A protein has these predicted regions:
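Internal, well-ordered alpha-helical segments in soluble enzyme and binding-protein domains
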Residues: 65, 145-152, 183, 210
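N-terminal Rossmann-like FAD-binding beta1-loop-alpha1 element of flavoenzymes
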Residues: 4-30
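Short beta-strand/turn micro-motifs composed of small residues
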Residues: 10, 33, 94
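Conserved Rossmann-like nucleotide-cofactor binding loop
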Residues: 14, 37, 194
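Flavin (FAD/FMN) cofactor-binding and adjacent substrate-gating region
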Residues: 78-159, 163, 170-175
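Conserved FAD-binding subdomain of flavin-dependent enzymes
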Residues: 21-24, 34-88, 101-103
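Short glycine-enriched loops at secondary-structure junctions
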Residues: 34-37, 121, 232
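Flavin-dependent oxidoreductases
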Residues: 17, 175, 180-232
């Protein structure tokens, strides 16, 4: 590993996007990653959803974030020569009359119309139960995390900026900005849940959230949308 403007610890989605942007802006970068051991990005759903939570509220700055994200990922597809970004509506299924009423009220509020809409009358919901109503969330998308991570890795390896291995904290000196004797202007940790094992940040009150993935196969027809319901 050679000295550089930046050393980035972790080649997950955050570290990869940051390294890519820095390289595009002419900075020198070195990345170290432990071969995605336990990386959450490989199992993440990759859903971009501007309307979230049980109260159906807009994500912070969603009107700005989605156009930026779309442009960013489309540029990545061109630069990395891959396909991993898909514009796709979210089909929100209501589980009760109360949820349906909440949707109706929220959709009528200022700033929500561009994100919330009704499906056409001939929409085929297939095996889905839409007894209490089904609605569309727009400006949503699906990103394929494994595909984009592999494309990023090939990109970084081709440029000689990625080292596969564990970061050795005993050979890191933040006081003089060196790692294994090499000089770096900035060190950026993008180590995800492993921040709990990072001696510089482990004191922070993190509470990692653990999810579940269920892979389902069915012969029933399902619409080509991202399908979700509110939790609870």
């Amino acid at each position: 590993m050679r000295g550089a403007d930046f050393i980035i610890v972790g080649q997950g989605i955050a570290g990869s996007c940051l390294a890519f942007e820095l390289l595009e802006r002419g900075a020198s970068v070195s990345i170290i990653d432990d071969d995605w051991r336990g990386a959450a990005c490989l199992v993440a759903a990759g859903v971009i959803n501007p309307i979230t939570g049980q109260r159906l509220v807009k994500s912070w700055r969603s009107s700005v974030a989605h156009p930026y994200a779309r442009g960013f990922y489309k540029n990545l597809e061109s630069r990395l020569r891959g396909k991993f970004f898909h514009d796709r509506k979210i089909l929100q299924l209501c589980k009760s009359p109360e949820e349906s009423e909440l949707w109706r009220r929220r959709a009528g509020e200022s700033g929500y119309a561009e994100f919330m809409s009704e499906p056409p009358a001939d929409e085929n919901f297939g095996a889905l139960d839409d007894s209490f109503g089904a609605h569309f969330i727009g400006h949503s998308a699906w990103v394929e995390p494994p595909a984009i991570m592999r494309a990023f890795r090939d990109y970084f390896i081709a440029r000689g900026v990625l080292e596969v291995g564990a970061f050795d904290f005993t050979r890191f000196s933040p006081e003089d900005g060196t790692y294994r004797g090499e000089k770096f202007k900035k060190t950026i940790f993008c180590d995800g849940w492993r921040v709990l094992q990072n001696p510089y940040f482990s004191w922070l009150p993190y509470r990692p959230a653990k999810g579940e993935i269920l892979t389902m196969k069915t012969d029933e027809f399902l619409p080509e949308h991202i399908i979700q319901t509110l939790l609870g």
